[in-house]
């Protein structure tokens, strides 16, 4: 089990990313646009750098919804490998069966 503080930190990051997503996308579009003036591109770069670090989506970490485990998380299910296996063995995940050949 991950600490509550780690789970809360990730939740706070998700909210921050969602809050700044549109503004970041607009600034990145200006930076990439070759038709924009160099001054406008520079100002957009500075504005992007002044945003909070946690506003970047690359700082988010996928965690298990049940345990908060940061490694071995399946994106499709949002569960860590251990909890996914337990759920599959109970039959809680439709269409997921243990392999046998």
Curated annotation (Swiss-Prot):
GO molecular function: rRNA binding; structural constituent of ribosome
GO biological process, one term: translation
Keywords: Ribonucleoprotein, Ribosomal protein, RNA-binding, rRNA-binding
rRNA-binding listed as a keyword: yes
Cross-referenced InterPro entries: Ribosomal_uS14, Ribosomal_uS14_bac/plastid
Transmembrane segments: none
Keyword flag Ribosomal protein: yes
GO cellular component: cytoplasm; small ribosomal subunit
UniProt xrefs under SUPFAM superfamilies: Glucocorticoid receptor-like (DNA-binding domain)
Domain of life: Bacteria
Subunit (UniProt): Part of the 30S ribosomal subunit. Contacts proteins S3 and S10.
Similarity remark: Belongs to the universal ribosomal protein uS14 family.
Role played: Binds 16S rRNA, required for the assembly of 30S particles and may also be responsible for determining the conformation of the 16S rRNA at the A site.
Name listed for the protein in its UniProt record: Small ribosomal subunit protein uS14
Taxonomic placement: Bacteria, Pseudomonadati, Pseudomonadota, Gammaproteobacteria, Pseudomonadales
